[in-house]
């Protein structure tokens, strides 16, 4: 696995596009790791301090993710080094998409990512540049549909990703108009844990869960885990957190989901960050879901989690451990050798899978249950393949990487 991994990590990307904004200090990169299957896909992010290496490592991460989620295409990523809070953000994005739109028409598909919104920024700005849909390049390069299929499937994509949930099994509150894109990644993280117990043995109901991050992914994963009978015992995010060793009720978690303030936990009894950070990592628990930023979990925190009884980690965040390696550094390796580590490219592939599902065939209707169950089944299949190669609860991530990399190297 190590050999395959270093081969994949060190292989030069097929295409790197570099951009410098003439009017601000913004700069950006598109990295297309490969045009496997004729196209590549990966979102567009913006943050201060982003560099080409970050974009390249995320493009490689996407390529691995597509081996699970489909379609069988290359990985890509776009990144802009600029402050997303700057009032000139929209102008910067307009000039950026004007520059990259020829790729988006031909062989590259993008979407929203960190600090870049799919619905309010990516779709309208790419449309202004003559791109039918941000995924048009994947249609043209990979699926090669005829015109009527293309129109139909672009319609499916547009409606599917922003479909308002009307099934109470998937929506915390039908009156709030939550959409597929709000919930699907967190749903996949929860499903990956349920499937882990289903395949390797054990029972999710009653298990104690620690959640890091209360954005779309963490809050939705916690909601669906609580719905399945798990007990959320601790939540930490950048503003503070909550700890309840006997576990919050499903109703309390539902309320915390509904009351969140954008991507932040919002509760009257919120503990400050210092207090919660001192307690969180030592709270007795069975499951930990890192759903905050990348490369945050230190070795000391991992050691505390293991000592607290954590035996399953499902990676809601991409590359959650504070390793410098693109995929699998010493901290990730220690986690994988000590407990059941479900890797990011399986656990958080929900959104990528929805894209593949909506693009690959002409559907009779768009149905919440069909979309969510398809994502769940995709995650189940990936874990089942892993189990066929390794029945131990240790080394799951290593085995899963091996299966993915054999398709790519």
Regions found by a protein language model. Name each.
Residues 67-72, 77-204:
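Glycine/serine-rich phosphate-binding loop and adjoining beta1-alpha1 elements at the start
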Residues 240-341:
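Rossmann-like adenosine-cofactor binding region
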Residues 167-284:
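Glycine-rich phosphate/diphosphate-binding loop of Rossmann-like nucleotide-binding domains
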Residues 23-36, 67-72:
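N-terminal glycine-rich anion-binding loops that anchor highly charged ligand groups
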Residues 306-409:
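Adenosine-phosphate binding glycine-rich loop
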Residues 1-20:
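Short, Gly/Pro- and small/polar-rich lid/capping loops
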Residues 32-64:
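N-terminal cap/recognition module
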